[in-house]
């Protein structure tokens, strides 16, 4: 049986939780009735299981040949698939795809496509419910823009929720985005938005549950190579014929 993997973002918190529970349970065992100690031990054990489960880090490797496929960057439920105005980077209409992550989902975030990271910015904000539409623009968030080898740009926005108080983004400008690699991590319930070209072909609908680095969300349209400019036909300059004067 394989030992469960724990994400590096949770190791310090798990150690702190174990120490805290030890400090709670030892006095309960010494100074309180056995039934009170048993209840406390059971409750604190459940808390430790939840914290450990929350920071689980499953191994997911997806092998696909088509570089235009978009892979889910996070676990959760699709809550938005619609054209919308993106005001922070593109300043134009894009196809927004949003995934809501509950506290029971894996909270690691993956790169949805391969390319080069152009932008990685963190913005402070509120901590409203991540399921609310305004959370995309008002909550604490991090924006990552990736340019594919075919020069198509997409944006991934990590959004903090009412419980999620910390966003971790590993992507930095100039980094190469590889499939099967973590883009970042969000602690507790949160949301991930993607902004895609309007002609992106989508394979999922609102209400569907997806798995990060497993579910194929859609496919970017093929980018046609620009046609070579037609050479302008050179026209011979017109010359005026000198009329011979009659003598």
For the regions a protein language model found, what residue spans apply to each?
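Contiguous, well-folded functional domains in the mature portion of proteins
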Residues: 1-247
